Every structure is written in C-alpha cells, then in structure tokens.
Amino acid sequence: MTKLPYALLEKGSLLIASPDVNGGVFSRSVILVCEHSPNGSFGLILNKTLEMDSPEEVFPLDHFDESRVRFCMGGPLQANQIMLLHSSSSEDANSSIEICPSVFLGGDFSFIQEGEIKSNDEKMLFCFGYSGWQAGQLEKEFLEGLWFLAPASQEIVFTARPDKLWSDVLQNLGGRFASMSTVPENLLLN
C-alpha cells in the first residue's frame, strides 16, 4: 500500500488519524472519504464498532448471516442518521453511489429489508452518523499533519478487523508509518 499525497484526496480514499490526534472520536480513526469537493468533505469512520443488543430493531435482518452485517459509529455528526455501506451491485440497489470498487453508499433500504441481496459474499456496514468538514477545514487539518492518506478497498471496508484497522493500514504504508503503528494509545505506557 502506498501513502497518497494530499492532491489525491478524493472519494474512495482513506483518512488515517495521526497518533497526534489523541482523545475524542477521531483518535486512531480510519475514515472512508465518501465525498470531497471545494465545498467540503464527508466520510464514515470504519473502525468504531457499535455493539447492538437487538439489531432487528433497526432493520429486520433475520435472513442475513451476522458475519455479513456490522454496525459502527460513522462520525459525530447527526448520530441518529443511518448511512449504509454495502457490496451489493444488485439492480435493487441502483440508487447507490460507488465509493470505491465494490463499495457502495446508500440505496433504497427496501432491497435489504426484502432480502434482495443475492450473493452470500455481500456485506453491509450500517454507520450511525458521519464525519464532515467545511470548505478548507480538512485541507488545513491535513497540512497540520493530523491525517494521512491511503487507498481504500472492499477488503479494508468490510473484511479487516476494526480493532486492528488503524495499525494495519499504517503498517501496510510502510516506512515511518509502520513505526507509528506501534505507538501505544497512552504514551505514558511507553
């Protein structure tokens, strides 16, 4: 995996929080950029898993294998809004937007509720809330060294272990980033 320069920040990139981002929701976050333009940016945190006692309260998912469905905190903004990342290219999901190869955002939730996902390989990530930046804000944070950039993939979004995602992505970038992947969360423990 190669670290991307800031000029390549676009939909489908990953933002990886620097170890300097300590405390708060963005500490050790890996964010999938879903939109980036001169007007601002938004993305979804991939590695802040939410444990839910009764996910059926959100959607009737009794026809899905639990290993294919995950819930996470997408970010601090509008936490009551649910955004769906999925791997279904089904015609029933045609109102979805492809973020990176085989990773789609949104769509009509009815294709899920009606069990229209046809492949056993298709996965879903329900994100509560999102992360957003006003025009110029993300650029400023990037120049301050608060974020690193890497390419996203379906494997990273749906298959990687959320609790190891931050360190794994940094490790895969190599060099000084691999060294950063071993920095303890609490520097007093170092």
Curated annotation (Swiss-Prot):
Q: Name one Pfam family in it.
A: DUF179
- InterPro entries assigned: AlgH-like (IPR003774)
An annotated GO cellular component: cytosol
State the source organism's domain of life. Answer: Bacteria
Please give the family membership noted in the entry.
Belongs to the UPF0301 (AlgH) family.
NCBIfam families per the UniProt record, alphabetical: PRK00228.2-3 (NF001271)
Q: Name it.
A: UPF0301 protein TC_0483
